Each structure stands twice: as C-alpha cells, then as structure tokens.
C-alpha cells in the first residue's frame, strides 16, 4: 500500500496536469500468479487487483470529485515456446533458438474522468511495454483493454562459451476493443486494431564489441517513425563506451521545434577506469535539429576499502533558452548506508551499460577458512 500527498508547487505541474489540484492518493495492489514451465515452454496466468482512492482534492478543475475511488481486476497470460537447433556459422559451432511469445491482457472499463491525474502519461512503446497490461505509466490512469502482443525472437549462441553473439526480435500488439480511458478530461478515446511494429537486433562478433539497432514502423503513417543505431564497447565490468544515433518522426506534432517529439540526436557516453579504483563518467547528448547540447554529464567514482565516493555534475535543457544544472555528491559507507545526493539514477539513465562501482572484493588468505 502506498499513500502520497500531492501539492502544487511553482513548477510542479503545468497545463492539463496542473488542473488536478492538490490532494491525497492511496494505492493498494495485490496479485497472484501461477507459473508453469518445462524445458521448452512456459505458461503464466496472473490476476491483479488494483484499488486507488483520492480524497481532499482541492483547487482542481470543475468535474473532478473531491473524493473518489477506483477498483478493478487486471488479467494477463504470458506464454511462449523455445525451439533449439545446432548449426555451424562462420566456422563456429552455434546453437540457434526460435522463441515465439504471446502476452494477452484484459482490463475492464472504469470511468476515470472525475479523477485527478497527478503522474500518468502514455508509456513509450518498446518491447518491455508489449508485455505490460496498462499502456499508461504512473498510477492515475488504467486503460481498458483486450489485447494480444506477439513477439518472435531468434538468438545465436556460441556452443563453446555459451555467449550470445547475435539476436533479432520483432513484435506487435493487437487490440480487440476500442479505448475509452483517456489521460485527461477532454481527449477522446482512440480506435485502432494494432500498434506500430517494433524490430531490434544485436550483433557482437568480437569480444566486448556490440552493434545495436532498432526501428519502430508506424502503421498509421506507413513509414519508420523511430530509429536507433549504435556501437558499444564493454570489455569488462565498470568499463563501457557507447555511441548512438536516434531519430524520431511524428508528423502530428506541430509544436515549435524545441517542444515537439521529432528528434535527430547523437549520444556519446562512457564509464572508464582512470587509475586504480578511480573511474571517470560522462555523457554528451547533441541535437542536430536544435544545434545544441541537450544533456551533458561528467562525474567520478572512487572506491576505497570500506567506502565509495561518487560525484557528478549534470546540465540539461528543460525549455527553450533555459537549462538546469544538478550537482551530486554521495558517500557510501559499505554495509551501513549512504550520505548525500545520489547520482546513480542520473548515471544509469544517461550512460549506456553503467554499473555502480561496488566495494572492493575481499582478498582471502590461505588460512582464512582453516579449522
């Protein structure tokens, strides 16, 4: 159970989200599942009960109740097969898999137009989202749905080392009912029978090197709406360098350039040892369309015997002509806790493949376990 108090600050909400006002929200979610699996199959039914209660809602737009509740069940079924065969490719013994997977979800309709929306938004479509019942992030909106996601994956695994050196995945979601739940209070529901098509591939023929690519094909516009391609070098833990190019296309977004979702960006990030137990961290995210650096980050991590020190500075553009600079400094006392503001979330979101530096491994002497 989670209880949260929302208050409007100077910059807490804007636009329609600010019309939700102030108030309290209490959540309670419980679920039960029964996983079944064999050597080449799995079958997992799941039922979730979700209850949300709002009270003491003030300063909200007309039509939002001062007190309201929502309760509903969420049904899902996740199932798949794994087929395997052995082959020889490029002179190496390889195990190839073919993995079809289906995810079905059903959520009945509940009218939510009289409820506030503090933190829900439309989740970005990706492969993880295809296996999620609710298309909205946050807790204030739960979409009605009767949907089926179909995903097909193939992997090539080195028979000698067990390492995966190639994979490709394609997937799409199909809808069997119209959407009725909207994010806000004057947005009509949408009618469609399928989502965009997602495809992704990874290739790591050489040790430590990985090529990655992904596309999203719009079934509405009949063209590619999102592209991501990049290369990453990750020879060992806490050592990674990545370079990516990202392109988004949305002809329906007519907002001025800085605010719309059409992007052309290059993203460079790294985590790399400078000297023993000292690691450098950085990110440089540049927009070709706006001709500005939209996000940059620099930091250091140092680990001693029983403590770890992390520091970082992040600067990002939050609106046209305005930027925000964040400073992070955290001291982690191994086994006791942390002091200061942690940069781990910013580093994890900004640096591809980032892993927080852990404590030094304990050196075991020859007589440490002698009895």
Predicted regions and their residues:
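Outer-membrane beta-barrel proteins and related beta-barrel translocases across Gram-negative bacteria
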Residues: 1-371
């Amino acid at each position: 159970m989670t209880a949260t108090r929302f208050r409007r600050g100077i910059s807490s909400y804007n636009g329609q989200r600010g019309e939700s006002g102030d108030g309290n929200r209490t959540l309670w979610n419980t679920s039960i599942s029964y996983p079944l699996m064999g050597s080449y199959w799995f079958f997992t039914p799941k039922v979730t009960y979700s209850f949300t209660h709002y009270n003491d809602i003030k300063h909200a737009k007309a039509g939002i109740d001062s007190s309201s509740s929502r309760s509903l069940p969420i049904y899902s079924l996740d199932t798949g097969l794994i087929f395997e065969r052995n082959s020889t490719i490029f002179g190496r013994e390889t195990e190839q898999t073919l993995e079809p997977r289906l995810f079905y979800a059903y959520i009945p309709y509940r009218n939510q137009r009289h409820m506030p929306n503090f933190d829900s938004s439309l989740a970005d479509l990706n492969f993880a989202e295809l296996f999620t019942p609710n298309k909205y992030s946050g807790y204030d909106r739960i979409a009605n749905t009767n949907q089926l996601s179909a995903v097909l994956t193939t992997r090539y695994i080195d028979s000698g080392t067990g390492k995966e050196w190639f994979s490709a995945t394609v997937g799409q979601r199909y809808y069997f009912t119209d959407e009725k739940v909207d994010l806000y209070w004057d947005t009509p529901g949408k009618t469609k029978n399928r989502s965009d098509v997602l495809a992704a591939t990874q290739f790591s023929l050489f040790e430590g090197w990985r090529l990655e690519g992904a596309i999203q094909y719009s079934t509405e516009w009949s063209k590619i709406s999102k592209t991501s391609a990049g290369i990453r070098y990750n020879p060992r833990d806490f050592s990674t360098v990545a370079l990516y190019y990202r392109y988004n296309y949305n002809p329906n977004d007519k907002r001025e350039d800085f605010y719309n979702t059409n992007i052309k960006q290059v993203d460079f990030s790294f985590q790399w040892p400078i000297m023993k137990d000292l690691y450098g961290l950085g990110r440089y995210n540049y927009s070709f369309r706006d001709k500005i650096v939209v996000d940059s980050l620099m930091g250091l991590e140092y680990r001693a015997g029983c403590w770890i020190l992390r520091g970082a500075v992040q600067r990002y553009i939050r609106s046209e002509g305005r930027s925000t600079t964040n400073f992070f400094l955290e001291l982690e006392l191994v086994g006791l806790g942390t002091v200061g503001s942690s940069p781990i979330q910013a580093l994890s979101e900004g640096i591809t493949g980032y892993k927080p530096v852990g404590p030094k491994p304990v050196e075991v002497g020859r007589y440490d376990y002698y009895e």
